[in-house]
């Protein structure tokens, strides 16, 4: 059985997902694309795929069984609600939506539908290294997790397109999600500290240090540096009661020659997480073919929005800003407190 997919948004990430769905993965076919730039959509559409000017028409098409949303964030709410109304599984790139109120509306619609349909594009949980780290923590051999040190470094970001809010409302959401998933815990408060600014970042608020207070009492510190020049460097170490567990450096190859010892650093997120992206979609295809979703949920997208909002407030106030979540609907499983 082949899942017939429509892709909304044909920018960089949309084109990468079209490539993945058409050239890398099996049991899936891209049968439709849509973009506000009709010429670009037509240029990247696979042979035989329909091109739609309006995303809603793609979603309602009888030939489309599932949808991938890669459009501009403010357009996500309407597109997600249309997918839920049509009963079609949907993969939505982050952000789920741009406001907590919008996240609640999407969540209410999905709960009313009665079955999970939405998966959000938090890909780190599909990375083999993160999965091994998660398995170690869940086994309990190191005792309870006490602290998680997360590092998120980019060589550079697009000048003029990446704003001072984006380390907190765009970059941070990956670290916030993976912290919740690894520790099986919710964020209850956020602090932000801004050290000396990097001269490479101009007027950007860069780097930043974020402290996430978790419901269990564990703490997560996140370093975000988006103009560090040398590459895309993702690190993580969990300190537990009886030891530590950390991610390996990637790629794992260590070179020794006349110049010394060195280890290459990935150039960007695609190089570091390409296998995670493939696995993310591999699992989504299986679930979508069954009419549902199993990966990061609307609840996770809602939580990420609240954490980002609190981080922006904390950057301005200098205080610990609370994260107040609504009661978790049973559709998204037990509360993390109950699961511990």
UniProtKB/Swiss-Prot annotation:
Signal peptide: none
Keywords linked to the UniProt accession: NAD, Oxidoreductase
Name of the top EC class for this enzyme: oxidoreductase
One Pfam family in the UniProt entry: GFO_IDH_MocA_C3
EC numbers, comma separated: 1.1.1.18
Reaction equation(s) it catalyzes: myo-inositol + NAD(+) = scyllo-inosose + NADH + H(+)
Domain of life of the source: Bacteria
Assembly and interaction partners: Homotetramer.
Job of this protein: Involved in the oxidation of myo-inositol (MI) to 2-keto-myo-inositol (2KMI or 2-inosose).
Protein name, UniProt field: Inositol 2-dehydrogenase
Organism per entry: Sinorhizobium fredii (strain NBRC 101917 / NGR234)
Phylogenetic placement of the source organism: Bacteria, Pseudomonadati, Pseudomonadota, Alphaproteobacteria, Hyphomicrobiales
């Amino acid at each position: 059985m082949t899942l017939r997919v429509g892709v909304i948004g044909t920018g960089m990430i949309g084109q990468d997902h079209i490539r993945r769905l058409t050239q890398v993965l099996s049991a899936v076919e891209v049968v439709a694309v849509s973009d506000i730039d009709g010429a670009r959509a037509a240029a990247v559409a696979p042979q035989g795929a329909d091109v739609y000017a309006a995303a809603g028409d793609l979603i309602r098409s009888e030939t489309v069984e599932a949808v991938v949303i890669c459009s501009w964030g403010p357009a996500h709410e309407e597109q997600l609600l249309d997918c839920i109304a049509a009963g079609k599984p949907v993969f939505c790139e982050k952000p789920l939506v741009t406001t907590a109120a919008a996240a609640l509306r999407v969540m209410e619609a999905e709960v009313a539908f009665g079955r999970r349909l939405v998966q959000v594009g938090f890909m780190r949980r599909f990375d083999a290294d993160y999965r091994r780290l998660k398995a170690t923590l869940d086994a309990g051999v190191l005792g309870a997790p006490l602290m998680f040190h997360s590092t998120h470094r980019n060589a550079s970001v697009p000048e003029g397109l990446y704003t001072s809010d984006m380390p907190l409302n765009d970059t941070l959401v990956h670290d916030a999600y993976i912290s919740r998933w690894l520790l099986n815990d919710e964020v209850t408060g956020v602090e932000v500290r801004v050290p000396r600014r990097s001269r490479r970042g101009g007027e950007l608020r860069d780097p930043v240090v974020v402290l996430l207070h978790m419901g269990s009492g564990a703490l997560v510190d996140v370093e975000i540096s988006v103009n560090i020049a040398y590459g895309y460097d993702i690190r993580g170490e969990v300190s537990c009661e009886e030891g530590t567990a950390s991610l390996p450096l990637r790629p794992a190859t260590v070179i020794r020659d006349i110049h010394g010892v060195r280890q290459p650093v990935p150039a960007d997120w695609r190089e570091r997480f390409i296998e995670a992206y493939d696995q993310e979609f591999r699992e989504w295809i299986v679930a979508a073919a069954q009419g549902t979703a199993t990966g990061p949920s609307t609840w996770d997208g809602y939580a990420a929005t609240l954490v980002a909002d609190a981080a922006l407030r904390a950057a301005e106030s200098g205080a610990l800003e609370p994260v107040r979540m609504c009661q978790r609907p049973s559709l998204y499983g037990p509360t993390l407190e109950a699961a511990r």
